[in-house]
Amino acid sequence: MGGWRRRLARPVDSPLVSLLPPIPTVWVFGDQLDRARGALAGRMPGECRVLFVESETLINSRRWHRQRLHLVLSAMAHFAAELRVEGFEVDYRRARTLGQGLRDHVAEFGTRRVLAMEPTSWDGRLELERLGVELVRNDLFLCHYDDFASWAAGRKRLTMEDFYRWQRLRLGVL
C-alpha cells in the first residue's frame, strides 16, 4: 500500500547532531489542533519535534461518521503541514495503536521526553500516563476538572446556580 505512512521528518545522521541532547516531542491529537493551546503554546521551531499518530485501533474503536473521520484526519494533516511551513520538525505517522506509534517515534528519533495536553477522556489520560507521557493541563475548557473538584469539595449539594455564581465571580463576569 504505497504512501500508507507519510513521513514528514527524518533524523539527521550528522555525527555533530548526534552529540546534541534529543529535543522533546510534543504529541498533538486530532481534537487539539491549536498552535496557541496546550503543549505547543509558546513553543518555537527548533525547540521541539511535533508528533501526530493516526491510530488504526482508535479509528476502528467506534463507528465514526465517514465525513467526521475524514474531517479529523484531514485537519491533522493540514495542521502538520502548517507547522512544517512554520519551521517545526513534524513526524506524522500511522500505526496500529497510539502506543505503537509513540514507541516507533522514540525508537527512530531517540526522544527521551514526550509532552501532550491532557486528553478529554479519562481512558486517554490513563493510556498516556501508562506510556510515560508528560501531561500539560488541558486549557480547552472554561473550567478544568481540578478547579471543579476544588469547588465541589465539602459541598453537600451541587447545583448549577451555585456553580454558575462561582464561575461568574472567578471569571469576572457580571
Regions found by a protein language model. Give the residues of each.
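N-terminal donor/sugar-recognition subdomains of glycan-related enzymes
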Residues: L8-P24, F29-G42, N138, D146-V173
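N-terminal beta-strand-loop-alpha-helix module at the start
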Residues: P11-R93
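An acidic- and aromatic-residue-enriched active-site/binding cleft used to recognize and process polar
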Residues: D31, S55, A95-R96, P119-S121, ...
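N-terminal Rossmann-like or analogous alpha/beta NTP/dinucleotide-binding catalytic cores
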Residues: R63-E108, R113, E118-L126, R155
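Beta-rich, aromatic/charged-enriched effector core domains that present basic-aromatic interfaces
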Residues: G101-L174
